[in-house]
């Protein structure tokens, strides 16, 4: 048995689930999500918990067991609590602001970079150097946060750029560290 696949998924109050052939629908206070899954697997509700079961120990079923359980758990958590990814800007003059729903970044280019959020994702700027990307779909929130970071990845020499909060950047030594001091070649 898959260690992840056999774990039950707790369904919080206020969340309704519906399973039809190959489609799992979950509705909660934050919204509604649909997760397609392999119809060979079964998702059943038992005492306020969801269980994902596989019909056999074939390689295909074993591979899909843990994946399906994780996708369903993320959907349940998304409609009840939601997901937030925090980003921070490092660099002199780097700042972010909201322009309507769009995120406007001033990050060292000759022009501000404007990023429109896709449906289901919202931006928040609690401070000029902090960005919160939030939504109910974990994959979409992560992809949008990665796209924002991609606009100006952290520099390897100074650490300037857009990074995830808590992300450690291994800085390179630079010219002085590479030659061993002044004047030596």
From Swiss-Prot:
The taxonomic lineage of its organism, from the top, reads: Bacteria, Thermotogati, Deinococcota, Deinococci, Deinococcales
Q: Which Pfam families match?
A: Ribosomal_L6
Q: Which gene name does the record give? A: rplF
Q: Which family does it belong to?
A: Belongs to the universal ribosomal protein uL6 family.
**Keyword NAD set for record:** no
* Quaternary structure, from the entry: Part of the 50S ribosomal subunit.
Spell out the protein name for this chain. Answer: Large ribosomal subunit protein uL6
Biological-process GO terms, alphabetical: cytoplasmic translation
Q: What is the protein's known function? A: This protein binds to the 23S rRNA, and is important in its secondary structure. It is located near the subunit interface in the base of the L7/L12 stalk, and near the tRNA binding site of the peptidyltransferase center.
HAMAP family per the UniProt record, alphabetical: Ribosomal_uL6_B (MF_01365_B)
Q: Which organism is it from?
A: Deinococcus deserti (strain DSM 17065 / CIP 109153 / LMG 22923 / VCD115)
**Which GO-annotated molecular functions does the record name?**
rRNA binding; structural constituent of ribosome
Example GO CC term: the record gives: cytosolic large ribosomal subunit
Which Gene3D superfamilies is this protein grouped with? Ribosomal protein L6, alpha-beta domain
Q: Which UniProt keywords apply?
A: Ribonucleoprotein, Ribosomal protein, RNA-binding, rRNA-binding
């Amino acid at each position: 048995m898959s260690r992840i696949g056999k774990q039950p998924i707790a369904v919080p109050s206020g969340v309704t689930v519906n399973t039809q052939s190959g489609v799992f629908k979950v509705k909660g206070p934050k919204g509604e999500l649909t997760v397609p899954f392999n119809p060979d697997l079964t998702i059943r509700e038992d005492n306020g918990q969801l269980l994902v079961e596989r019909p056999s120990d074939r390689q295909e079923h074993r591979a899909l067991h843990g994946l399906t359980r994780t996708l369903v758990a993320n959907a349940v958590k998304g409609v009840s609590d939601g997901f937030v990814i925090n980003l921070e800007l490092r660099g002199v003059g780097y700042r972010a602001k909201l322009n309507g729903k769009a995120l406007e970044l001033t990050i060292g280019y000759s022009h501000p970079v404007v990023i429109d959020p896709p449906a289901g994702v919202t931006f928040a700027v609690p401070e000029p150097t902090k960005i919160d990307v939030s939504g109910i779909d974990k994959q979409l929130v992560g992809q949008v946060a990665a796209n924002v970071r991609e606009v100006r990845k952290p520099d390897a020499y100074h650490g300037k750029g857009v990074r995830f909060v808590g992300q450690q950047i291994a800085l390179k030594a630079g010219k002085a560290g590479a030659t061993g001091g002044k004047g030596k070649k």
